[in-house]
Amino acid sequence: MQYETLNQLFFAAMETHRKPDALLVKSEGSWRPVSSQEFLEKARNLALGFHELGLKHGDRVALLSENRAEWFFIDTALQILGVVNVPIYSTLPAQQVSYIIRNSESKAVVASTASQQEKTVSIRADLSTVEHFIAIETPTPSGFEGLTLDDVTSLGTKKAESEPDLHRELASKVRPDDLATIIYTSGTTGDPKGVMLTHSNFVSNVKGTLQALPPLTTADVALSALPYAHVFERLAAHYLFPAAGITIAIAEGVDKIPENLAEIRPTVMTFAPRLYEKMHARVLENVSQASPARKRLFWWAVGVGREHGSYRLKSEAPPTFLNLKYKVATALVFKKLQQRVGGRLRFFVSGAAPLAPEIAEFFWSAGITILEGYGLTETSPVIAVNPYKGIRFGTVGQTIPEVEVKIAEDGEILTRGPNVMTGYYKNEVATREALEEDGWFHTGDVGVLSSDGYLTITDRKKDIIVTAGGKNIAPQPIENRFKANAYIAEVVLVGNQRRFASALVVPDFERLGLWAESQGLSLEDMQALVEHPKVVELLQSQVDEINADLAQFEKVKKVRLLAKEFTIDDGELTPTLKVKRNVIETRYKKLIDQMYS
């Protein structure tokens, strides 16, 4: 297929593959297929409907919605017109929604559910540029006063009867360097910045990433679960997977992933490390409850898997007897884990945050491949990914074709390529700070590049902890070690300009609860539980194990356990489940200060 714009990609993909199940959508308890033809017609009718409303090339439309099939149809319709899609996370509060709509000067707002529509009602007076409010679901709340998506579709259907080729004509006028989207970063400080990405940015990233990944075919099925407002899943599910002819099943939600994995039995899936961390924690939790004999069997299998995996990493044939042992380990232990992810998974792709190498290696030993990659919103997003034959745990792999990386004198990762954004919307100062005149983009990440091109991310440049003694500590690798522990769900390392490193730890409450019950401890008061001497002693023993492998200046000297998980709703996590470090440090300042008093 030849394509230079997202429109060319879309039409070529739909007409080349002609799938009966381009999408799979869960409805009333069963999965309903959406064919390529139905997808084409829905996108066409919406495009012409938006056109009838007066939306034209270069206008901005805000899309406030969770993942759903309509997200695909609306995004495609907007691209056909050359209209800029401004996606907004459904988890954002009304105040932040207002800022994005106002800053982008959106001409229309599409809101999915009643709760999303209510946000637009509460901020409507501030949205002077908005001419159309459009609801995906009905009934709409009081005060919404707008159209429904069905209304827009009806307008387009009528227009298609009189001008059946108009959508093709409009789509052909969109150029590769035209703006496709403005994605507002879920920044942890200040107002978010609007990242401007073109059709060419996305198309180059689709082509480069497809070359870097194992071959994908029309027989593949992907389970799609990360928010479409995030560039990682947008690139994968909306552009890359369709280009390859992959069937895309839209997960019902993050909490339904285990159930959907069993139903869909995907062959590929993209997600953030939190999924793999939780899967790993559940496995260890189940093992902890097993009989001594089952525990011995499990750890024997893991040992065999690691030895067998070391040969596979080097593309070498394992010895015959090791192969035999691995078959036994798979039959008795690993098969159950493989079945939990559907039983036919070829590989996961991990992005949006760092993945602990211990977790990637564990799944590799069990016959489940996780390809860790790296990218940012500003790079459309993929910069690098581990090759299927040549995985190196702890690295994010090698750059994809046409993308360059170099390390600046201060260790910052710089990148250049056709995937790099054109700039930040209406923010020349931030654009000049991030983009050099010769095209090099400052990622804000610190890393190391090996002689054969494997990139290792050390940390965010701004997150590096400098102790009072002048020692530099990169928190992410240490935090990843903590999160690989079965009793620890989340951790934030602190210690900037302090004498030593300390940590705020969120326990894995499910695992901790089982242990506490076995010790006769009450679970009614979580604050009392995390302060109980037995619990403190248990977690301290886990910290001591982690500290044993750290340099003296990196050792975590003090720990405080938190009584609740970090959540998106409380503003502590981004929509891709990354911790907002500054929010945590501000919220728990008294607790942090106590560790140094």
Predicted regions and their residues:
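Conserved AMP-binding/adenylate-forming core of the ANL superfamily
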Residues: 2, 22-76, 93-98, 148-156, ...
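Structural core segment of the AMP-binding/adenylate-forming
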Residues: 10-11, 53, 80-155, 538, ...
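Conserved pre-ATP/AMP-binding loop-to-beta segment of ANL
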Residues: 18-21, 135, 157-184, 191, ...
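Conserved AMP-binding A3 loop
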Residues: 33-37, 173, 180-206
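ANL superfamily adenylate-forming
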Residues: 115-176, 283-336
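Conserved AMP-binding/adenylation subdomain of ANL enzymes
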Residues: 203-224, 228-334, 344
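Conserved ATP-binding/catalytic segment of the ANL
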Residues: 399-467, 484
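Conserved C-terminal "lid"/linker of ANL adenylate-forming enzymes
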Residues: 490, 536, 540-597
